[in-house]
UniProtKB/Swiss-Prot annotation:
It is found in: Cytoplasm. Residues 1-71 are annotated as: Disordered. Signal peptide: none annotated. PANTHER family: GRPE PROTEIN (PTHR21237), GRPE PROTEIN HOMOLOG, MITOCHONDRIAL (PTHR21237:SF23). This is Protein GrpE. Keywords: Chaperone, Cytoplasm, Stress response. One of its GO terms (cellular component) is cytoplasm. Residues 38-53 have a biased composition (Polar residues). GO terms for biological process: protein folding. It comes from the Bacteria. SUPFAM superfamilies: Coiled-coil domain of nucleotide exchange factor GrpE (SSF58014), Head domain of nucleotide exchange factor GrpE (SSF51064). InterPro entries: GrpE, GrpE_coiled_coil, GrpE_head. The gene is grpE. The lineage of its organism: Bacteria, Pseudomonadati, Coprothermobacterota, Coprothermobacteria, Coprothermobacterales. Belongs to the GrpE family.
Length: 228
């Protein structure tokens, strides 16, 4: 082989090696993007799911915090309302006690007023009866004297009986009857006469009373046993 042929073959071999090297380099370059693509697919395939899961957890946590805050506010509101109701109840209870005390006081005052009115009415009635009785005493005395001289006069007896009935209606009753024991609280001593010791022998003038109030004592003669 001459030098010229050898040189051509070396050039061809070098060209073939260069072409082969270029192809291998191109192949390697095409494989690297594929690996990068796989990495992109791996990143794009796994990270969104993790991100979504993380976002869901964060949203759930935020919702829980929101619910807890709302619950706390609601509890605070309920506690405030409870305290307000307790204050209102305390005020109402105090007002109730004051009202009970007021009603009890009014009831007591009403009872006192009623009793005072009753006593006042009784006093007025008694004073009226006393005044009326004193006005009738002279008439009764006149009738009694007339009946001493004319005991058979039924007309006079009827008039006297009617007057006594009117007095009794107002609580006025006679005191001092023959045969009773002398009582200085109701009787006025005029003298002695022979008879049972300390007994009323004669009623000179009748006495009258209302209850325990003496309007006029009875004038009486009491008995005294003879010393002989």
């Amino acid at each position: 082989m001459d030098d010229k042929q050898k040189t051509n073959e070396e050039v061809k071999a070098s060209s073939f090696d260069s072409e082969k090297s270029s192809k291998n380099q191109a192949f390697e370059n095409t494989e690297e993007p594929a690996e990068g693509f796989q990495n992109v697919q791996h990143d794009n395939g796994s990270n969104p799911a993790q991100k979504q899961n993380s976002e869901a957890k964060e949203a759930s946590k935020d919702q829980t915090n929101t619910n807890n805050n709302e619950l706390s506010k609601k509890l605070e509101q309920l506690e405030t309302e409870r305290l307000t109701l307790q204050e209102k109840i305390a005020v109402l209870e105090q007002q109730h006690r004051e009202l009970e005390e007021f009603l009890l006081k009014m009831k007591h005052e009403f009872a006192l007023a009623k009793e005072a009115l009753k006593r006042d009415q009784e006093k007025k009635e008694r004073l009226l009866a006393e005044s009326m009785a004193r006005d009738l005493f002279p008439i009764l005395d006149t009738l009694d004297h007339a009946l001493e001289h004319d005991g058979e006069n039924n007309g006079l007896r009827l008039i006297r009986s009617q007057l006594v009935s009117v007095l009794e209606k107002y609580g006025v009753v006679e005191v001092g009857k023959e045969g009773e024991v002398f009582d200085p609280n109701w009787h006025e001593f005029l003298g002695y006469a022979e008879g049972p010791e300390n007994k009323i022998i004669k009623v000179v003038r009748k006495g009258y009373k209302i209850g325990d109030t003496l309007l006029r004592p009875a004038l009486v003669v009491i008995g005294k046993e003879s010393s002989c």
